[in-house]
């Protein structure tokens, strides 16, 4: 029997509502029959509308309510089905939630978790599919989590909920159908925020990614290994705090670096990793580091264009060969065929 990321997130939310009377869930659509892509299904029926609260379309005001609840001793989890909608609440996040603990000398905690779901798929276009994790990581006082796999998505969410101060949990809905056996021992493991995971070991090149990009990166890494290139894949899991120790340990070994970032290239988190590595590494790299990310343009809506715009396993593998100055195999595209449509798998039926 298998479970997936959707079921694991629902399990975590259910458990916290059951075990902690101070835990609340708020957001647009949390009581909807679709239950935020299935992650809140049945919760309002089990725990009532005073614990699972449908909110008005007023993101800034409702985030202020969430901050106030957290300061008052509750543990609210706010959900936005589109990261883009949360832009309206940046004032409350930046000037209240992120700074409160610091402004009051550490005497007051703000245990607020904000689940932001990125909306790629079915022609969502420029205003429903942005990846703004670099933006959030720039804000002092915030932690930023980006789950990738079914094996630790639930543990990362639980660690975010347990944290005494605000955590932005950025969740790509393309990870929702990632499968794992219900008896897999990894589902029982706890995760510490700020600790990356080496998903596959290698000596030739370090590939660093997070969120859904780790899934595409793993496809590329498996292809590279089949071609005799031992790539090491690091899934960051949290981009703030950033686990530079694990990154540097790997780069010292491989002496080659490729960073994969789901966001736009300019002022990106991927460039932050490259800069930190170059400032910290004691030995010379064999080749200049590379970044695979989005171009400096808004996301297109057209199905005919989106495939080329987004980062894929093909682009990642191609960049790895280029980093190592190795010819790209002729069967690359045939073996790692890019998605022909803007959907991750047959499970994804839209419209959202």
Whereabouts are the PLM-identified features?
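Thiamine diphosphate
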Residues: 1-166, 170, 175, 336-352, ...
């Amino acid at each position: 029997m298998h479970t997936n990321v959707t079921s694991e997130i629902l399990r975590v939310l259910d458990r916290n509502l059951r075990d902690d009377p101070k835990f609340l869930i708020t957001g647009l659509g949390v009581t909807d029959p679709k239950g935020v892509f299935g992650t809140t299904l049945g919760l309002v029926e089990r725990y009532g509308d005073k614990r699972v609260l449908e909110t008005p379309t007023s993101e800034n005001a409702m985030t202020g309510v969430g901050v106030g609840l957290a300061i008052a001793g509750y543990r609210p989890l706010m959900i936005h089905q589109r990261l883009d909608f949360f832009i309206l609440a940046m004032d409350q996040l930046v000037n209240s939630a992120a700074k409160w603990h610091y402004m009051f000398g550490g005497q007051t905690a703000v245990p607020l978790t904000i689940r932001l779901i990125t909306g790629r798929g079915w022609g969502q276009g420029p205003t429903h599919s942005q990846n703004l994790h670099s933006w959030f990581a720039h804000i002092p006082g915030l932690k930023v989590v980006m789950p990738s796999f079914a094996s630790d998505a639930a543990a990362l969410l639980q660690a975010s909920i347990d944290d005494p101060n605000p955590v932005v949990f950025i969740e790509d809905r393309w990870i929702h159908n990632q499968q794992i056996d219900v008896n897999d021992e990894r589902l029982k493991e706890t995760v510490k925020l700020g600790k990356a995971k080496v998903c596959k070991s290698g000596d030739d090149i370090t590939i660093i990614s997070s969120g859904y990009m780790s899934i595409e990166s793993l496809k590329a890494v498996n292809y590279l290994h089949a071609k005799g290139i031992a790539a090491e894949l690091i899934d960051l899991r949290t981009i703030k705090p950033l686990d530079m120790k694990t990154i540097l340990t790997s780069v010292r070994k491989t002496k080659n670096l490729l960073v994969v970032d789901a966001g736009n290239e300019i002022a990106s988190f991927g460039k932050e990793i490259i800069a930190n590595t170059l400032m910290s590494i004691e030995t010379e790299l064999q080749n200049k580091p590379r970044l695979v990310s989005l171009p400096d343009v808004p996301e297109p809506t057209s199905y005919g264009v989106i495939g080329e715009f987004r980062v894929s396993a093909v682009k990642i593998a191609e960049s790895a060969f280029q980093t190592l100055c190795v010819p790209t195999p002729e069967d690359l595209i045939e073996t790692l065929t890019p998605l022909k449509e803007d959907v991750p798998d047959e499970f994804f039926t839209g419209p959202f």
